[in-house]
Amino acid sequence: MQDLPVTLQLGLIGDNIAASRSPLLHKIAGEQNGMDVSYLRLVPREMEQDFDGVFQYAKDNGYRGINVTYPYKEYVTKFLEVEDPLVRGIGACNTVIFGEGMPKGHNTDYSGFMSAYRNVRGNLAPGAVLMIGTGGVGRAIAFGLVGLGCKELRLVDRDMLKAEALAADVRKTAPDVKVVCGSNAEALADGAQGI
C-alpha cells in the first residue's frame, strides 16, 4: 500500500462512546479517498476536562473537524456559526468544521434525511406528514421536512411538552407550516400522506 499523502485529524466528543465504530469508519473512508485519517474519541471526563476544555483542545491542536454526540449536541451551538436557519431552529449540531473564523456547525441527521428523501422522491415536496417521536433526531427530521417543502406536520409523542416545544420552534422558524400536536397517532394519521 502506498503512503497516504494527506493527514486529517478528526474526533468525536461525547460521553459513553467507548464502543463507537466511528474511528474505523473514518479511517476506511479516508483510505478510500487517499487520506490518512486520525479519528480519536475525546471523552471529557477521561481527559479530566469539561466540554469547553476538550472543544478548545481540538480547535487548538490541528483538528479539522469533530463530531459531537450526547450530551453535548445542543450545548456546542454556543461556540459555532450555524449558517442554515433550519439547523439553528433544530438547536443542535453534531458536526463541527474548524477553519478560518468561527467554527461552523452542521447537523447531519437533518442533512442526511433530506439527502435520502431527495434520492428517492426528487424535488417532490412531502404532503401532510405524521411524525411519531419528537426527540433529538425527530427535531432534525421535522426541520428537514420543512426544508423539503412540507406544509403540514402532525407531531405525536408521549411527552406533550416536548412535542409542543418542537411545534413552537417550527412555527417560529417557518410560520407558513401548519403544525398540530397530539398523543393519538391513529387520529392524526387520518389524511396524512407520509408517516
Label the predicted regions.
Residues Q32-M35, G149, K172-D176:
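Short helix-capping segments at alpha-helix termini
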Residues G14, N107, Y117-R118, A125-C150, ...:
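Glycine-rich adenosine-cofactor-binding loop
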Residues L161-D169:
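Short alpha-helix adjacent to the SAM-binding motif of class I
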Residues L130, Q193-I195:
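Short SAM/SAH-binding signature in class I
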Residues L40, L153-R154:
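Conserved beta-strand positions in the Rossmann-like core of class I SAM-dependent methyltransferases
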Residues D3-G122:
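Phosphate/diphosphate ligand-binding glycine-rich loop within oxidoreductases
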Residues A174-Q193:
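Short acidic low-complexity segments
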